[in-house]
């Protein structure tokens, strides 16, 4: 990820990219490259990749996600390898469940796809501590991502472990496997430019390259976003929203784009960024126009930050990322379909793009025609980089209209096969389905249990003391979000005091004599709160969390302060319920049941209920409306942190999204934002593999701040409305997805300027002929295709574009 994507520290892990063959099956054994592209068994190849992170989904989801990616025209999948997930405690390894990285690669190979193994150790990725295991901090003398033996020894050991696992499974190309590239380090050039680190960084990055090449994997090694000080034995690549202007500083290296950001992550306190489909298509088309040969969508499927894996600060549990496949694995239309059409056109031009001669011709400012020629064939790109005007371009006697901020692709230099701004694919609006399960809500029988605070209010076993305020991550060894600080003083005066705490904690709860006297979340600069460990930067092992150093003061009404920072402090990490693993619902837990009411708005409370799994295969979510802040589990599986009470800022420009112009993931840009004034996240993914079929499922909540579980509901996410626009001569295809849902009605068939957006269109010039045609072809069907003809037009309609909306 880029610098803006991660807030604080360096990140660590392994990133893997998986590349699908353009033909069925894989069999590449010799991998090389030249200045134009990768060369696989002697053939130059275009690679179109997409990121899918295996721990952000489940093994049961992997085959379907990979299948959809391949059907979307990808010939690559990318993923990080997550060190702190695989080695949470030193020399204790986890390669089970959704951390079974070898199984994930085998699923990709089974789909007929190649793989690129990107080994960090740095990943960022909005992942807890950037993928670094926290125990690294305990190694004497360690400095992250600089030239020093403690860090390099740990990095080499983990890199060697991952390489060995891949070799043992015959995953490298020379073994008949899918891996055709490997990466060491990640985005190092973003963070390590401090003057005092230049020499150490230089030695470290060259050590990385040498260490990687000694692994003898038989494929080239890459470094992404490494434009400065590139070692001679690696290939550097580009990351960003746009990479058409980027070229390697060595002409022998092909132009490769390892992270094309399809959207953006979401913070708890911010609206959601939506990168327009037209803009992504524009960026990809421009990249290949300007000699690109490999590009990867980050993300193609974002998934979910289950458990405590969300990085910081403020990253939500959902890692949807506005990707072509949504958090649950559903197609996000039109993004998925429009890019699929682009991929098809690009792959049809593979030979001429990678072997042909080319010439760029400027047609004034911001308009460029690129013509590729090979033997007697030619292919052309025309781009219009103006963000405020359409243009007409005459090429070989034919005039072509280009909307602003768009690229047209002409595989024969005569006929436009694709324009990035003209979307023909349907738009799908997903909705929360009212189902029998949702109707169970009023019948949920809740039981509850107070969190036992006694161990933290007294100096019981497990506590330890220090005459200083300690750093939270080290003290908890990152095994819990919660750290208790306790001190005592003799108060002889009268009157009231204000407790002042300078902390990098995310939320603070204050107790006096065992009673909760207040809680506070502070997003302002007086308190720098964060939800999880930092995950971006250089020497971020030095960046503190918690009430480290303080000060902690009691301030009386006169302004006099008692500084408690150097008092004797007692510490204990975690919750009693965490130690007892209440979330596993073991026998012996003393749940309290109430026939009619349960305590609400009570901090530090556990709740439990049961529900039946919804029928079918639609995506399942739990709606936590009414709750405040905490953690949720289903059948012992952590859904992650929840915070539905945190409402995103309401700001000007929300919901306004003009695709034209440079996309920036900045709230200040006030462009392409949604969810303003709404909960940052209210729905939490429950993968089908978490659920028991035909048996009760247990939902357990730990509510830390006090909420009302009576409004909690289990829902399914399904296609609601499907819409499309097309000109005469085009075909319109509408589909209600792959789970047997059918089109129930046609709502709008307008051959004019339809007002509104998909799901709420108001036809401006209704066409009865078009309506009847779509009703006859579509109602009662899972999908339908209709040819748009002149007969659909109405006299007096201004626009020649048909807009249709149907309900699933």
Swiss-Prot record:
Pfam families on file: BetaGal_gal-bd (PF21467), GHD (PF17834), Glyco_hydro_35 (PF01301), SUEL_Lectin (PF02140)
Keywords linked to the UniProt accession: Apoplast, Glycoprotein, Glycosidase, Hydrolase, Secreted, Signal
EC number: 3.2.1.23
Leader sequence residues: 1-28
Molecular function terms from GO: beta-galactosidase activity; carbohydrate binding
GO biological process: galactose catabolic process; plant-type cell wall modification
One GO term describing the cellular component: plant-type cell wall
Residues the record marks as carrying a glycan: 249, 260, 366, 375, 392, 432, 502, 526, 566, 595
The reaction(s) this protein catalyses: Hydrolysis of terminal non-reducing beta-D-galactose residues in beta-D-galactosides
Location relative to the cell: Secreted, Extracellular space, Apoplast
Keyword field contains Hydrolase: yes
Keyword Glycoprotein in annotation: yes
Domain SUEL-type lectin: 726-808
Active site: 187 (proton donor), 259 (nucleophile)
Family matches, as InterPro entries: BetaGal_gal-bd, Galactose-bd-like_sf, GHD, Gly_Hdrlase_35_cat, Glyco_hydro_35_CS, Glycoside_Hdrlase_35, Glycoside_hydrolase_SF, Lectin_gal-bd_dom
Similarity remark: Belongs to the glycosyl hydrolase 35 family.
Protein name: Beta-galactosidase 14
